[in-house]
């Protein structure tokens, strides 16, 4: 399997509803909740790509460009952006759409770096 095929197969998509218990005082998705969801999707993507134990080592620039109101549907999309020897970068985008209208907007984008670990919790090669 080629690297591009492996990247395509590991792309992860999850849909969620934004309920009021996940919002802030502006009735939009709380940023910390968005980051938690993004890290989870990034973890799943990294694990599906490598099929190894993976841990988050950093979250790079996170851009919140569009509010995510309560009562909307979001899609989180995780995709491998770069593969190093023992680490990989995963881009996660959150798209928001109204429940009863067409269209959607990209609301949040972030890059997460993961390291693959062996059974001794030491960095291990991703591509063998």
Q: Model-derived features: where do they sit?
A:
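Short, well-ordered turn and helix-capping elements at secondary-structure junctions
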Residues: 18-22, 59-66, 96-98
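Acidic-enriched, low-complexity/disordered segments with a strong bias for Aspartate over Glutamate
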Residues: 27, 39, 60-63, 93, ...
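Small beta-barrel nucleic-acid-binding modules, principally OB-folds
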Residues: 51-67, 72
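HotDog/MaoC-like acyl-thioester-processing domains
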Residues: 2-14, 68-70, 81-128
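Generic structural signal for well-ordered secondary structure
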Residues: 35, 55-57, 85, 105
